[in-house]
């Protein structure tokens, strides 16, 4: 099964959060992948060149999955369906569409938004302290 990581999980890992690091170490047999939009969100959070290099080095440890045209179309449909009722954002719609397209599990703490997407396998990866 393909497994994607959302931005919030990767931010915890980058910050060295003990629960995130322990979970990542225990799940070493899993092959985690990162949707391209998540990688871009991480770069947007960088404040200087040192952070940018650190994030890029971290991202190089994962396979990044870029959306196909059909996934953009599905993201559009998700946005049209859920934007006014759940607040699902454009990045969240792309992440959901890519996850659905690959029948992947998505680990995130943003369950409120993603749970409205039918058929999406979404779970919290670990308990936050």
Language-model regions, residue ranges each:
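Short, well-structured N-terminal submotif of metal-dependent ribonuclease cores
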Residues: 1-34, 44-57, 128-129
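A generic structural signal for short hydrophobic patches within well-formed alpha-helices
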Residues: 10-11, 39-42, 114
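Active-site neighborhoods of divalent-metal-dependent phosphate/nucleic-acid chemistry enzymes
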Residues: 64-112
């Amino acid at each position: 099964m393909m497994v994607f990581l959302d931005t919030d999980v990767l931010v915890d890992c980058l910050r060295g959060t003990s629960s995130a690091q322990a979970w990542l170490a225990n799940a070493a047999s899993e092959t985690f992948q990162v949707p391209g939009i998540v990688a871009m969100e991480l770069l947007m959070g960088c404040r200087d060149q040192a952070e940018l290099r650190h994030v890029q080095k971290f991202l190089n440890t994962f396979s990044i999955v870029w959306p196909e045209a059909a996934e953009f179309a599905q993201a559009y449909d998700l946005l049209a369906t859920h934007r006014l009722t759940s607040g699902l954002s454009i990045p969240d719609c792309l992440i959901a569409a890519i996850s659905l397209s690959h029948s992947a599990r998505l680990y995130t703490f943003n369950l409120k938004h993603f749970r409205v997407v039918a058929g999406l396998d979404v779970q919290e990866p670990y308990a936050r302290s």
